[in-house]
Amino acid sequence: MKQKVYRLLIDTQEAWPFERTRIPSFKKLSDSERQQIERYYFDMDAKMALASILIKRHLVSTALECSPNEVQISVTKAGRPYCQSAHCPPIIFDFNVSHYGGIVIVVGAWLPSDPSGMRPINIGVDIVECKPLAFEASWMEDFMSVFTPCEWKLIKSSISSIDVFFLLWTCKEAILKALGIGLSGNPLDIVVTFHKLNELLNSEEVSLRRAATAVYSGYSWDLEIHKLILHSSTFYVSVAFPQDCVIMDLNWETLNDL
């Protein structure tokens, strides 16, 4: 079954180069949503939180062909967003959101449901900026425990070790988010295999279907990976799909405002 995938991106630094309260969409929020945004100390964090609310609403309203005002987003106990009205067995509209460094993305698709609950059916997405997480040269060693011996060897043997580190990291995070357990799960238990690593490392910008596969608890996922250049910095995006999905395209829609 071929799936149309919606991939939306908003660069909050470009879209809203002013303080949060001057953003027109801020006034469209409910009182509780505004209070949620106002709790953030830094404007970048507040803008990403605002964009996350709006981009999910925009995505679901597009998929359901309704007004954004009609969309009600809920979250699971683990914090995974969903829209109850988008659950229409034998299919559901599933989506996942991620943000980093002022960039907010959401990916969604209509997927076949699984009443038996015996196989993964959800999408997971993660974005990360490819830059050191600390000033110390040995900062990667602090994260060695989340990688298998083969994965760690791949990181350390590569001339682009920081890229391989973040590629593996974002693939594992995408799987955990597909499962709806986030970092409460153990990334070490996710085994990632790259199929197009050289193309990812040697391209300035690229989007690759089935760039990797991952196995967790006996289940398998395909991972599409996108390498984006934003604000002169490299970002990696991993999107995890159930393996029976056939993806039609790899395009992103960049939103200038919401």
Swiss-Prot record:
Q: What EC class does the entry list?
A: transferase
What's any one GO cellular component for it?
nucleus
What is one Gene Ontology biological process annotated in the Swiss-Prot or TrEMBL record? Answer: lysine biosynthetic process
Location in the cell reads: Cytoplasm; Nucleus
Catalytic activity of the protein: apo-[ACP] + CoA = holo-[ACP] + adenosine 3',5'-bisphosphate + H(+)
* GO MF assignments: holo-[acyl-carrier-protein] synthase activity; magnesium ion binding
Main subcellular location: cytoplasm
Q: Any idea what job this protein has?
A: Catalyzes the transfer of a 4'-phosphopantetheine moiety from coenzyme A to a serine residue of acceptor proteins, such as alpha-aminoadipate reductase. Necessary for alpha-aminoadipate reductase activity.
This protein is called what?
Answer: L-aminoadipate-semialdehyde dehydrogenase-phosphopantetheinyl transferase
Q: Which organism is it from?
A: Schizosaccharomyces pombe (strain 972 / ATCC 24843) (Fission yeast)
